[in-house]
């Protein structure tokens, strides 16, 4: 494929920049801290906050866990604080990353040794052996179109703050593009969640590569228009590959020089709150993404399904996130599909998903894409998964060996939805 032809040059530049990333986190550890009853859970949370430690996940409930990142200069204080909460707690902590910088470097080595495909311009599943640069992701989408020209074309959904086009692929069937109800997939709105990029691309590749060989897949592609955007936060994604592997937000300045970026998934103009930016929908990425969703729902073909892919946590959730008491108008139907997706997802590798509304399943989240797509854009179904990284203990820095299994289990879940949506 063309990405391979350009890879030697692209990766030469990228690999030159990558060593700066592990140096940021050299000696940093990531721990999983088990929590007991609610009082202990709250105490651990306050302790972590007092030390100003970044958390990868928070305890969703009592008798859960908190994944926390601890730099080497805070290690002694962290262990002492654990003992102050409970004298036995320090012995129960699990180390997720002994040296986060080394883990990031290992992940980057996998990228730099990506397989070279001799078939220039053709998309193959060798792509899913490793992670890739942003430039190569764009090339891969173009390779998909070149490989499957009768069923795919490039689409865009606005631009980022730094001027990058938000690029996706439209997959369509025998009736042509734009004639069937829309299914829209977003990936990597949180820049550090690289697995979301690969999984959305694997779903796209699977739909296209099976169109002519599977009557079932052909029926799905003929029935719906798929719009798949693997990277909806391109500025943040590029920043994770050049400066800080664990960056989450976009790169839009704020009024504070020390606080850069909007959380694009708290910026949607529905039940928005101040942590999502200066005003609702003020991130350029959101403006373009919202306009694209609204255009699909206002078209004659209509809007069927929206999914915003995230990592990590092994969850599959629907509306609402803004309130734990609000219920979707078709809550029972959403619940049914969530549970069916989870069963299909579990079949290949035994990974169990927790399902339910966002707010009651993980935490309250205002200004999120799922609520917007469901309540404003009027997509019939709206979901968000949290993918792998929890049970393996790798979190956001997921080894390349987990890419393909992640895509396979998600694809099984997607096929369930396509077969069972009303």
Task: Label the model's feature ranges.
Residues 2-6, 11-422:
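M14 metallocarboxypeptidase catalytic domain recognition
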């Amino acid at each position: 494929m063309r990405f391979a032809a350009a890879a030697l040059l692209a990766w030469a530049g990228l690999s030159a920049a990558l060593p700066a990333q592990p140096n940021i986190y050299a000696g940093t550890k990531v721990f999983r801290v088990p929590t007991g009853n609610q009082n202990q859970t709250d105490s651990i949370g306050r302790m972590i906050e007092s030390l100003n430690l970044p958390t990868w996940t928070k305890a969703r409930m009592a008798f859960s866990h908190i994944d926390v990142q601890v730099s080497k200069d805070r290690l002694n204080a962290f262990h002492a604080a654990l003992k102050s909460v409970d004298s036995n707690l320090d012995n129960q902590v699990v180390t997720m990353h002994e040296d986060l910088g080394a883990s990031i470097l290992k992940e980057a080595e996998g990228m730099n040794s990506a397989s070279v495909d001799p078939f220039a311009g053709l998309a193959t599943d060798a792509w899913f052996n490793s992670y890739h640069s942003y430039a190569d992701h764009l090339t891969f989408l173009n390779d998909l179109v070149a490989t499957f020209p009768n069923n795919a074309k490039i689409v865009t959904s606005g631009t980022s703050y730094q001027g990058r086009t938000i690029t996706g692929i439209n997959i369509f069937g025998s009736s042509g593009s734009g004639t069937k109800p829309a299914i829209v997939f977003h990936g990597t709105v949180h820049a550090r969640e690289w697995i979301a990029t690969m999984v959305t691309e694997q779903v796209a590749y699977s739909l296209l590569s099976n169109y002519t060989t599977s009557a079932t897949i052909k029926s799905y592609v003929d029935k719906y228009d798929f719009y798949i955007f693997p990277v909806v936060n391109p500025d943040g994604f590029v920043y994770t590959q050049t400066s800080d592997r664990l960056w989450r937000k976009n790169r839009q300045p704020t009024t504070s020089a020390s606080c850069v970026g909007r959380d694009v998934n708290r910026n949607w103009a529905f039940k928005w709150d101040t942590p999502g930016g200066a005003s609702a929908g003020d991130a350029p990425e959101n403006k373009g993404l919202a306009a694209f969703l609204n255009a699909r729902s206002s078209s004659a073909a209509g809007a069927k399904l929206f999914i915003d892919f995230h990592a990590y946590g092994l969850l599959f959730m629907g509306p609402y996130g803004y309130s734990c008491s609000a219920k979707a108008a078709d809550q029972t139907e959403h619940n049914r599909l969530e549970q069916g997706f989870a069963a299909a997802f579990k079949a290949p590798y035994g990974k169990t998903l927790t399902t339910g509304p966002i707010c009651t399943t993980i935490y309250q989240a205002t200004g999120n894409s799922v609520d917007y797509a469901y309540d404003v854009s009027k997509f019939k179904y709206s979901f968000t998964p949290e993918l792998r990284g929890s049970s393996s203990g790798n979190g956001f820095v997921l080894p390349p060996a987990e890419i393909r299994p992640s895509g396979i289990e998600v694809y099984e879940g997607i096929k369930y939805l396509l077969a069972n949506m009303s």
